[in-house]
């Protein structure tokens, strides 16, 4: 047997022993608290957003990146509307936060992130955002922050046509259809959209027009579910295709690039009593063409993911074993790895939960764990958690040619989180604060010869605190979302970044939403404030993005007994210069209209 085979055999034996020990602990602990009325699935204190009439329309006709701007915990990174969108959430960066689809981690293990511009908003639930260290308890590779995506075919008959127009060259058309035949429920969603993204912007005292940042995409989703022999089953398919142009920054325009992406994801789950089995297949193809003068450089890559997940849940425990095979091929890397995860969560009492998680990746075993304490106070629930999680190196970081580093260590977090919720009558107040230390932060750094390579450079500290206040009085809805972030690099091999703030973390972010009835419709006023951000690791002044303030106005109206719903919006009313990435200005004041045509019930 080869040396690699011997290592794999020994590793799998150790992982099997770990799974057996975790499972036996869970079975032994079931007798400790069999009278508890709170299930383990309710162990995390998660805040739900307030959705207005305008939000419901945006949810159907936009992507997750655009919709989540209403949440101050979410910090977007995007060149232009519809372009590739990544995010910072709860103090973490994009690769440290995970995106789950019905419990399956679909964040690419090739790049480490998922482009939120191709995630339809319809997959977002009111409690989809999980901030801070609690994200590690529901993902297989998360450290801090994440999104839980899902949607459901309820069997309710629905047929809606969706139309959207924008003043910057955008057009979208979609259809949402649902119902049932026999005992099988179904729901389908298809949407096509495009935009030239032609909009004015200012640079100093000069006015210009943005061009060359257009995009188009297609999204199709279909779900069937039902019950057979007392077992619940569900099948999903999700297909996306997109093209995104990038004319370059306003300082280096004239070197356009084109990103083409096709992704097919399919999932099937079967659940009977305490047992649930899920299977997932994901295939993605991507081509990036960079135009430099007369030379076109094209980088084509593929990514495949196969995941089989088994869940065994009791009243006081959750047990998970997940086996995945991921491969990345194409121009710049060609590799495949096995990923095995075992997770055990146990409710020891009404107050205490414990989570243990282990993974096999790149012939190594990684471990993580968390303690969660919840108060018994029903009016003011308080929760405290502390733990340590990991972020595994991605395929690109390990095998990118040239520059990959197979000797990378996994990133490691140590953190503590406190959350509290207070609700009385029409007032709801939620507060959370996270303190995290990250070790072995992976950063791409230029080496000798100009080749960039990922290395474990730094240790950093982040503190993220969020306040959510919701007040409903009659026909008026009021929500304030506030997030404050503090970060510092504690240890670094690069002296210029030691003691500096992490990049793309605004020191504060505030979103205020006021929604009320007027003239038989609903008017929504949404104000945004975003603090200073550093975009250079040495925090040089030239890389500072100054604080920005802007407001959006939306008016929603329905008629013909609700068969026609109309929402008009004025974006960036104050015509503020908005920038998420330096030298890529976002649109100033512009307009949009969304129409939803519902069939008769």
Predicted regions and their residues:
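Periplasmic-side early beta-strands and strand-to-turn transitions of outer-membrane beta-barrels
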Residues: 156, 176-259
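N-terminal periplasmic accessory domains that precede
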Residues: 39-41, 62-68, 85-88, 114-120, ...
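Short acidic/polar hinge/loop motifs at secondary-structure boundaries
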Residues: 104-132
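Gram-negative outer-membrane beta-barrel transporters
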Residues: 318, 344-351, 429, 435-437, ...
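Extracytoplasmic beta-strand/coil segments of soluble accessory domains associated
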Residues: 65-105
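Outer-membrane beta-barrel signature, preferentially recognizing the C-terminal barrel domain
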Residues: 97, 252-267, 381-439, 445-473, ...
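Conserved C-terminal beta-signal and adjacent last beta-strands/turns
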Residues: 177-181, 189, 214, 225-228, ...
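N-terminal periplasmic "start-of-domain" segments of outer-membrane beta-barrel proteins
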Residues: 31-64, 86
